[in-house]
């Protein structure tokens, strides 16, 4: 059993022009109804207060000097750790000048979690274009978090993206690259590395004693013996054979079009897919509002809603907090599992 309660979750606000503020405010207002774990936002107080007024929400904020103050405040006021970089309130209109604050919020969340002052990092969505315009050089959240983790550990980190929902956990081997580049970038070594990390995290944080991995093919019908592509037999099959030699329960390559119906899903704990959409389409189709983006392979827990900034509905009061709520709940569950395992 745990010797002491977990600290609160650290929630970075994401792009302030998107729906991050909308869904974070909505989630806190439903904290009792949804039995949410304590969390604090890392955001610009003025921008967040302006969004609350814009949405007609009555929210009192508790400006924290220490994250440990969050739990006591959580029942009556929304705990908020103020950014040094201010944000301009501009619902639906991403601004390059907000980039520094977006990056700072992520860095602060990671720092506090690594120090043990937060149980996990929960990130609201960011927009890549304004960040790139400000000099950000990472394809997305996942790669930036890996760099921060690498600085902390003093060695490179391999981040693995998992989409986790109530009916499916799906992991893409390649992530944010054009589909045309996938065959050239796919390697046996990378498939083995991603699968190892997935199996380890399923044991360590998800509490699955003997994880079962279903590994997809790349081509239609998993290549059909080479008739529809060589990668399945030349690249993917050797990876599966290596995983089996290491004692990991892995099978495939499986045709992707028959992997995701209910009887197939019942036979594995995670699907290892070869590219972004092969993993994300079934995950989101099965449970769009309940699926959570989890980054595996980091020295801290990180979850995120599975939607983007949704600039077109920001500030309109129609954004649903379901996916953020699911991300918070999963982050808390993973933190509790890890704490129990280490107790």
UniProtKB/Swiss-Prot annotation:
Keywords: Cobalt, Cytoplasm, Magnesium, Metal-binding, NAD, NADP, Oxidoreductase, Pyridoxine biosynthesis, Zinc
Pfam families cross-referenced by the UniProt entry: PdxA (PF04166)
GO BP terms, alphabetized: pyridoxal phosphate biosynthetic process; pyridoxine biosynthetic process
Record-linked Gene3D superfamilies: Isopropylmalate Dehydrogenase
Name of the protein this chain belongs to: 4-hydroxythreonine-4-phosphate dehydrogenase
Catalytic activity: 4-(phosphooxy)-L-threonine + NAD(+) = 3-amino-2-oxopropyl phosphate + CO2 + NADH
Family named by the database record: Belongs to the PdxA family.
Domain of life: Bacteria
Subunit organization: Homodimer.
GO cellular component, one term: cytoplasm
Job description of the protein: Catalyzes the NAD(P)-dependent oxidation of 4-(phosphooxy)-L-threonine (HTP) into 2-amino-3-oxo-4-(phosphooxy)butyric acid which spontaneously decarboxylates to form 3-amino-2-oxopropyl phosphate (AHAP).
Cofactor (UniProt): Zn(2+); Mg(2+); Co(2+)
The organism of origin for this protein: Brucella melitensis biotype 1 (strain ATCC 23456 / CCUG 17765 / NCTC 10094 / 16M)
Cellular compartments annotated: Cytoplasm
GO molecular function, one term: NAD binding
InterPro entries: PdxA, PdxA_fam
Residues that hold substrate according to the record: 141-142, 284, 293, 302
